From Swiss-Prot:
Subunit: PSII is composed of 1 copy each of membrane proteins PsbA, PsbB, PsbC, PsbD, PsbE, PsbF, PsbH, PsbI, PsbJ, PsbK, PsbL, PsbM, PsbT, PsbX, PsbY, PsbZ, Psb30/Ycf12, at least 3 peripheral proteins of the oxygen-evolving complex and a large number of cofactors. It forms dimeric complexes.
Membrane topology field: Multi-pass membrane protein
Location relative to the cell: Plastid, Chloroplast thylakoid membrane
Protein name: Photosystem II CP47 reaction center protein
CC cofactor note: Binds multiple chlorophylls. PSII binds additional chlorophylls, carotenoids and specific lipids.
């Protein structure tokens, strides 16, 4: 036929059977990719340390999505929360992956069947004997069915009425587990961090979808609207479908990057704003302060800080620290975290407690500056030693560790103090294994960053696709070159070839 590559999809333009076939094949490819990717991730995933080597540090992409929907166990005998299990049941990680691959195979066969048997009676308009689709009716059917699925997910799966519930955690990502969620029908349901809003919104949106679907099945569109929006043209369907997809992609890019109940930090890693705002640092200091108020020693108070909370307060877990073109997981960057060394407290020879100024997100290097509780600079690591006033050596800075592996250890030699001051710029200090994966020491992004980048990019591309196909379908007669002052009225669309002698004409 000699079509250029960008026009090959026109072969299914007036062929409903094969249009259906290629969409079933597309579903087969998507489902097959999901199942295969899940099996690959399970093959390389190490579940042994859910605290310091969680899924998001290992660059897992589909495992977090399965987990947030209630899958936590593996046929390998491990659970995502740690420990071993004996009876994972059919809906394990491997079970879900297998179901997607089986479904992919069935869709593949169905696509072939519909490609071969394309000329079905159901696609034939009995009035003309030609293939046609009742697009408004199909829209109603799809709206109704998606409404049923949406309502069912919110009312049964999320609430635990018939299903496991979803992943729910505390604001600091420490106690996450899969549990049923009650719908939140008040104003709190609009808080993006309230899990109950997921249930209530799916129930409400599903109900609306069911009612709207029934409406579109029972009410025909007015003729002017039908013609004005080109409802008989399949490219209108393409344009509006692309609009729905790019809108959804923009929304989920936002909920992923800024954080929400749908993107728990235990599954996708913390957000960059939690580092920018000192979110975990404040909670750690609050807990230490509460411990001191209970007459605990500084060492005891810091030892009660969960390693998981301390690990969140480390810049290497900030998704904005990885470059867009640095491939690989976070573990391939700064290494696999082995243990928390403890919290370093710096003091000068006058006894002032000093705090290392933390590195902002978008800096690769940052001056080492130590300030006291009033924000006054007391020490630094100078760029030009000849002009230094506040160097570690001059000020006599020492460091002592509280909690972690170095609990109670102190150092006074300047080289060691400066080493830990540099590391304290990056948040809490961890021992990192860079040998196992040959990690290069350059920070990587988490799946949160990759998901956001991918969906924001494709949303932008799909936005242009919506404009393109929307314009093509609305202004098809203009683009085809029909003269608006033509004496003979051409019924454009009955035949799409201009100048075709068989095109029906009606004299005005």
């Amino acid at each position: 036929m000699g079509l250029p590559w960008y026009r090959v999809h026109t072969v299914v333009l007036n062929d409903p059977g094969r249009l259906l076939s290629v969409h079933i094949m597309h579903t087969a490819l998507v489902s097959g990719w999901a199942g295969s990717m899940a099996l690959y991730e399970l093959a390389v995933f190490d579940p042994s340390d859910p605290v310091l080597d969680p899924m998001w540090r290992q660059g897992m992409f589909v495992i977090p999505f399965m987990t947030r929907l209630g899958i936590t166990n593996s046929w390998g005998g491990w659970s995502i929360t740690g420990g071993t299990i004996t009876n994972p049941g059919i809906w394990s990680y491997e079970g879900v992956a297998g179901a997607h691959i089986v479904f992919s195979g069935l869709c593949f066969l169905a696509a072939i069947w519909h490609w071969v048997y394309w000329d079905l009676e159901i696609f034939c308009d009995e009035r003309t004997g030609k293939p046609s689709l009742d697009l408004p009716k199909i829209f109603g059917i799809h709206l109704f069915l998606s409404g049923v699925a949406c309502f069912g997910f919110g009312a049964f799966h999320v609430t635990g009425l018939y299903g496991p519930g979803i992943w729910v955690s505390d604001p600091y990502g420490l106690t996450g587990k899969v549990q049923p969620v009650n719908p939140a029908w008040g104003a709190e349901g609009f808080d993006p961090f309230v899990p109950g809003g997921i249930a209530s919104h799916h129930i409400a949106a599903g109900t609306l979808g069911i009612l709207a679907g029934l409406f579109h099945l029972s009410v025909r569109p007015p003729q002017r609207l039908y013609k004005g929006l080109r409802m008989g043209n399949i490219e209108t369907v393409l344009s509006s479908s692309i609009a729905a997809v790019f809108f959804a992609a923009f929304v989920v890019a936002g909920t992923m990057w800024y954080g929400s109940a749908t993107t728990p930090i235990e599954l996708f890693g913390p957000t960059r704003y939690q580092w920018d705002q000192g979110y975990f640092q404040q909670e750690i200091y609050r807990r230490v302060g509460a411990g001191l108020a209970e007459n605990l020693s500084l060492s005891e108070a810091w030892s009660k800080i969960p390693e998981k909370l301390a690990f969140y307060d480390y810049i290497g877990n900030n998704p904005a620290k990885g470059g867009l073109f640095r491939a690989g997981s976070m573990d391939n960057g700064d290494g696999i975290a082995v243990g928390w060394l403890g919290h370093p407290v710096f003091r000068d020879k006058e006894g002032h407690e000093l705090f290392v100024r933390r590195m902002p997100t978008f800096f690769e290097t940052f001056p080492v500056v130590l300030v006291d509780g009033d924000g006054i600079v007391r020490a630094d690591v100078p760029f030009r030693r000849a002009e230094s006033k506040y160097s570690v050596e001059q000020v006599g800075v020492t460091v002592e560790f509280y909690g972690g592996e170095l609990n109670g250890v102190s150092y006074s030699d300047p080289a060691t103090v400066k080493k830990y001051a540099r590391r304290a710029q990056l948040g809490e200090i961890f021992e990192l294994d860079r040998a196992t994966l040959k990690s290069d020491g350059v920070f990587r992004s988490s799946p949160r960053g990759w998901f956001t980048f991918g969906h924001a990019t494709f949303a932008l591309l799909f936005f242009f696709g919506h404009i393109w196909h929307g314009a093509r379908t609305l202004f098809r007669d203009v683009f085809a070159g029909i003269d608006p002052d033509l004496d003979a009225q051409v019924e454009f669309g009955a035949f799409q070839k201009l100048g075709d002698p068989t095109t029906r004409r009606q004299v005005v």
